[in-house]
Amino acid sequence: MNLMQFNFLILSTDGRFRTMANMSLDNEYKLELAKTGLFSHNNLIKCIGCRTILDKINAKQIKRHTYSNYCISSTNALMFNESMRKKSFTSFKSSRRQFASQSVVVDMLARRGFYYFGKAGHLRCSGCHIVFKYKSVDDAQRRHKQNCKFLNAIEDYSVNEQFGKLDVAEKEILAADLIPPRLSVKPSAPPAEPLTQQVSECKVCFDREKSVCFMPCRHLAVCTECSRRCKRCCVCNAKIMQRIETLPQ
């Protein structure tokens, strides 16, 4: 393979992955490296998007490159991979300490394009590349540049950042189910079962009583068994970030 062919090969993730064929690494790990722009050449690990050159796999250096604030290839990979951005918040000791027990906040930040790149207290947007000191989710959202693809990436429902700290009384209020209003319209046929039973039955199996409240949308719609299979709310299709079990009505 001549140099021109090799340069063409490393333009794609698959091509960079193929350059690592002789490396004694797990294929899944090789693919992750290739996604961030890394490839193997003359027994060295190089990057197509920055000047990174490694003579061997170094976990710390690989992590710094993966969540880089300077590499074009890593930034592009982060921009198209929310799970990768989310993982950055658990990849550094300082981020684990800062965002401990704040999984909902981390989800919201990752969804908005932000990731942690190793500088204590600071975040970077994978879309507009803005770097700033983190204060709150709302403040972070205002930092986006006007042409950023994540500028309007806001959930339909707002979540209190300190939701995990709500007391029992507040959680019971959030878990309350609103019964649909009764209409003064005479039905054309008698109901198959009492209205109270329809209101309290699970919207998935229509058998057991609903007892799990989804957050952040706050819909109480399914039973405990069915809730385990739900990734999105069956009422509004919002992504489920937390489940709260309630007492039978």
Swiss-Prot record:
Functional description taken from the UniProt entry: Plays a role in the inhibition of host apoptosis.
Start and end residues, zinc fingers (RING-type): 202-237
MF-aspect GO terms: zinc ion binding
PANTHER family membership: INHIBITOR OF APOPTOSIS
SUPFAM superfamilies for this protein: Inhibitor of apoptosis (IAP) repeat (SSF57924)
Keywords carried by this UniProt record: Apoptosis, Host-virus interaction, Metal-binding, Modulation of host cell apoptosis by virus, Zinc, Zinc-finger
InterPro entries xref list: BIR_rpt (IPR001370), IAP (IPR050784), Znf_RING (IPR001841), Znf_RING/FYVE/PHD (IPR013083)
UniProt-listed Pfam families: BIR, zf-C3HC4_3
Gene Ontology biological process terms, A to Z: symbiont-mediated perturbation of host apoptosis
Residues passing through the membrane, by range: none
Chain positions of BIR repeats: 85-152
Organism annotation: Autographa californica nuclear polyhedrosis virus (AcMNPV)
Protein name as catalogued: Probable apoptosis inhibitor 2
Highest taxon of source: Viruses
Annotated binding of Zn(2+), by residue: C125, C128, H144, C148
